[in-house]
């Protein structure tokens, strides 16, 4: 039966000033999340996992998919469906053609609904086809309760349910999107002008993300509003090397347009005053594992228990080590002063030979507040052969006939 050993590694964390925690009552949003943008850990959540309509914050997914699945110089043909989308819209006409890159600025700066549909139909063949790609990507990113029906965030419903996401999932999507430099460049642009491919129609769009100029370190952001969703907002901010993602759903209705800025500032302040990055602690010292029915190696490297019979014992001790995957090396986490990461090693009491070098022996789990952050393999340092009848025959022949 596996023996579970808990080893707590003390972490030295920079001093930070204690502040009052972000209380649900202090936020206007129905759902809110403050996330560690480097690893997706939720630092604060208010109904973080409750599904809600998310309006034009949907366009974060539309944009990142377009950047990954198409080229900026693609010709996008406008359909009647795209041209008939409600406000806010660019005002494109059926049959017009645009470069995809220009429509991405229209999509993310001014949040044009017709541009979203034109992009979706170009890439997915239809709105429905593009929605399938959106939902596939959401699952790939680890979203737990997200279902996309429309590329612009307008209310929609299909056999999979209504168009919705959660504050946690929305933050996760933004954390992924900002890894794309072109996405960041587009969403940081204040003003952009372009024409259709014919060059006859000129357009100018201004970024509606006013938060770009309210705080230092804003990397990206997207606003949204429908009568059903209320005001929504998601942004990424890096301050003092700390990467925060804020996601807000249902943050007020007309007359309270600035609630989203207030909530975002509160959450960022809470993050700055309570969290500092720390690296993973050192691995704990791992025990040696008893290996039964083992034959010694050529140099007999293992400590053995002699039975004075002239033959080797059948038990040796195996040294083991933990290995972090390449993707987990250098990971760090935003922690409060009172938080520590613990290592939990899951290892067998003993194993039978043979054992191969670098064979998996167990697992080492990094946990915080009882939740797993990551896991890594524990492997064998050396090879151990199994002692067999042939080994005994060879031993006798060597000892008595040579």
Regions from the language model: what does each represent?
Residues 1, 19, 37-38, 239, ...:
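Short, ordered coil/turn segments that flank beta-strands lining enzyme active or ligand-binding pockets
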Residues 1-20:
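Sec-dependent N-terminal signal peptides of Gram-positive bacterial secreted proteins and lipoproteins
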Residues 6-9, 27-28, 50-51, 83, ...:
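Generic detector of short alpha-helix boundary/capping microenvironments
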Residues 16-181, 198:
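Active-site-adjacent loops and short helices of periplasmic peptidoglycan-processing enzymes
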Residues 161-402:
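Domain-terminus/edge residues, biased toward the C-terminal soluble/receptor-binding domains
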